[in-house]
Amino acid sequence: MIMASSKLLSLALFLALLSHANSATETSFIIDAFNKTNLILQGDATVSSNGNLQLSYNSYDSMSRAFYSAPIQIRDSTTGNVASFDTNFTMNIRTHRQANSAVGLDFVLVPVQPESKGDTVTVEFDTFLSRISIDVNNNDIKSVPWDVHDYDGQNAEVRITYNSSTKVFSVSLSNPSTGKSNNVSTTVELEKEVYDWVSVGFSATSGAYQWSYETHDVLSWSFSSKFINLKDQKSERSNIVLNKIL
């Protein structure tokens, strides 16, 4: 009787711990048309009448940021696990000068609060330095050259992925109209760079000079995160532990 009670107590404690460990929040959304309820708009960012996210005005010295309306969990401090994520968006950058003009458009993961622990992770589509780069806390980790004029005024498809198992951070940019593409990938240990919750979105600046401004639109956006390691490892461990308990 005492042995049976001990087993039941062990099982109850294990299930309680497992329930706590499963508390990581996964996120998935698809936005085909933006509105002010699914975004947090800052600076000059606005939503057009046809549902496009406009990150800069049709003029110089315009700066803005736009984030998904809810924070997203990227790391689980209880386990130390980091989510894998996959995000896709369609963007349109239009320059108004043949030479390098403004700064470009960034995809960003930033701490929910400025004083929060964790760095900013950025994918830069830099039109001034003509490069696509993966940055952590303003440090260029990996970059490749690109020519914005291969995409100028045309809808470009972007895919950004992070695999928490391999720690590979990948970026691909393509122009369906011309077949042009650019790709960059590198290893990033996100568990050392980010804290649990981040704001995910975009930032852009149109340029400091009237003769060299550019506009930046995002037409659609999808995002999904999953604690792959967390679930797979727990499922395997739970079966082993339950067998031992029972």
Curated annotation (Swiss-Prot):
PANTHER family: CONCANAVALIN A-LIKE LECTIN FAMILY PROTEIN, LECTIN. This is Alpha-amylase inhibitor 1. Keywords: Alpha-amylase inhibitor, Glycoprotein, Lectin, Signal. Heterodimer of chain 1 and chain 2. Glycans are attached at N35, N88, N163. Residues 1-23 form the signal peptide. Sold as a diet aid under the name of 'Phaseolamin' or 'Phase 2'. GO terms for molecular function: alpha-amylase inhibitor activity; carbohydrate binding. Lectin and alpha-amylase inhibitor. Acts as a defensive protein against insects. Residues 240-246 form a propeptide. Belongs to the leguminous lectin family. The keyword Glycoprotein applies. InterPro entries: ConA-like_dom_sf (IPR013320), L-lectin (IPR016363), Lectin_LegA_CS (IPR000985), Lectin_legB_Mn/Ca_BS (IPR019825), Legume_lectin_dom (IPR001220), Leguminous_Lectin (IPR050258). The gene is LLP. Pfam families: Lectin_legB. It comes from Phaseolus vulgaris. Proteolytic processing yields active form. It comes from the Eukaryota. PROSITE patterns: LECTIN_LEGUME_ALPHA, LECTIN_LEGUME_BETA.
